[in-house]
Amino acid sequence: MINFDQISVIDDFLPKEQFEQISSLVMNTTENRFPFFIQKDVADDAEISGPWSWYATHTFFIEDEVHCVHFPLIKELFLNKFRNELNVMSGLIRARANFYPWTPDVRQHNWHTDYPYFRNNAALFSLNTCDGYTSFKDAGKIDSVANRMIFFNAHLEHCSSTTSNEYGRYNINFNF
């Protein structure tokens, strides 16, 4: 059982066929048609700025609205597992894919919390293995490893990073 009083890491979260289905879709390895939208700053990084401090997102679902034709796949692969197998989710707030670009050296973004104005939990699914990571202020770094899921209390201060050994760092973020 997942305990949100601590950070939980599950490797090989999806069966191989399901993982390949979602990773090839989001990482554009099949049709080159998955749209990402540029965000100027990561986590309101006003003090951390520069040509490297951007990322791109693709929202599947946010605040009771489906935003993507691929949401049924997200529901099938992840949300049903969250509800029925892991019993960690009653309602979804947001599901979003993130792309952090390559930089010559790994760069860390600003510390932040997700939806700080109400209690919620998060799950972060890595789509590729790279030298990027998610860092928790009080718990250290967790490497980006393909098919790895991290569950945590979204009020824990955390941050993302870029990658220096892949084209980009890809993940899917869930808040519930």
Regions found by a protein language model. Name each.
Residues 1-89:
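Non-heme Fe(II)/2-oxoglutarate
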Residues 30, 135, 174-176:
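Double-stranded beta-helix
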Residues 84-104:
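A short glycine-rich, His/Asp/Glu-containing loop-to-beta-strand
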Residues 102, 142-158:
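Conserved metal-binding segment of the jelly-roll/cupin
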Residues 106-111, 118, 126-145:
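A short beta-strand-loop-beta hairpin characteristic of the jelly-roll/cupin
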Residues 110-112, 157-165:
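Short beta-strand His + acidic residue motifs that chelate non-heme Fe in jelly-roll/DSBH
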Residues 123-125, 166-176:
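A short hydrophobic beta-strand segment most commonly corresponding to one strand
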